[in-house]
Amino acid sequence: MNEKLAELGCQESHFENPSGLNGDNQYVSAYDMALIAQAAYDNETLVEISSATTHRIAPTTQNPDGFTIRGEHRLCVTEDPSSPYYYPEAIAGKTGYLIKAGNTLVTYAVKDNRRLVSVILKGQPRQYFVDGKALLEFGFRSFQHYTVADYESRYVTGNETINLDKGSFQASDLMIDPDKSEGQAGLRKT
């Protein structure tokens, strides 16, 4: 499990058990929780399951009538669309509570083909739904997708060392200048 965290880029998390319940050396940051959620919600089957508002449990010998379980994530599930907690763009998520972490809320939302994940840790009862909704509204209002090439004239290449016939350069030493002709490669040392 911790290997998967590393693969996802999580740097401030460690799990001791698969349940997520308290452990002496178990912790997760909000950022890492968002990375985990983003990877989870790339799985369409998981999105379908976790976005279900109810699920009917079949009858058993212990419970001959069966029963229905309902989702508790108020941004995703509501009987009242005017509820201050409901957010129609919220597709799925998870609620939780631990003594150390308090009320926790992870929400996955999609609007105009943009996907956002909000994470609330140490939230207050019911208020964490309001806070999660506010984070998503802020994100969709404040951030846009755009093609850098349409707006910028210089690009930094990344974090890897680049080997060229003139030597090795750190990415921060190079930039791409799209105004250069193709024959000049557009790379130059900054």
Task: Give the location of each predicted region.
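Short, charged, amphipathic alpha-helices and their helix-cap/turn boundaries
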Residues: M1-S13
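Asparagine-centered polar/low-complexity signal
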Residues: N2, N17, G71-H73
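Surface-exposed aromatic
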Residues: S13-G23
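Domain-terminus/edge residues, biased toward the C-terminal soluble/receptor-binding domains
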Residues: C10, D24-Y27, Y31-T190
